[in-house]
């Protein structure tokens, strides 16, 4: 499903989000969302990626998960 390059790219972006590099990090606590997204990427779990996409309150995290879904050509929930 995912190449090692894709995993590296996604996990790097998650690290940036965890470091608070994105604007809505200060508005919302997305720690749990990031934890589950990271797990979904490591385990290549489409279900976890879709769940984070559908349930997060963070617009930037939603956009990021949407990008993953589109890049992997999987259907959203």
Swiss-Prot record:
Keywords: Antibiotic, Antimicrobial, Cell cycle, Growth arrest, Host-virus interaction
Highest taxon, organism lineage: Viruses
A biological process term (GO) from this entry: regulation of cell cycle
Segments crossing the lipid bilayer: none
Its job: Acts as a host growth inhibitor by inhibiting DNA-binding of microbial histone-like protein HU, thereby preventing chromosome segregation and causing filamentous cell morphology and growth defects in the host.
Assembly and interaction partners: Interacts with host homodimeric histone-like protein (HU) hupA; thereby replacing dsDNA from the HU-DNA complex.
Protein name from the UniProt record: Inhibitor of histone-like protein HU
């Amino acid at each position: 499903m995912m190449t090692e390059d894709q995993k590296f790219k996604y996990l790097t972006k998650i690290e940036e989000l965890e470091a608070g590099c994105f604007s809505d990090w200060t508005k919302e606590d997305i720690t749990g969302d990031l934890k589950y997204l990271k797990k979904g990427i490591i385990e290549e779990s489409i279900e976890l990626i879709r769940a984070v996409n559908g349930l997060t309150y963070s617009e930037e995290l939603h956009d990021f998960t949407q990008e993953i879904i589109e890049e992997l050509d999987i259907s959203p929930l």
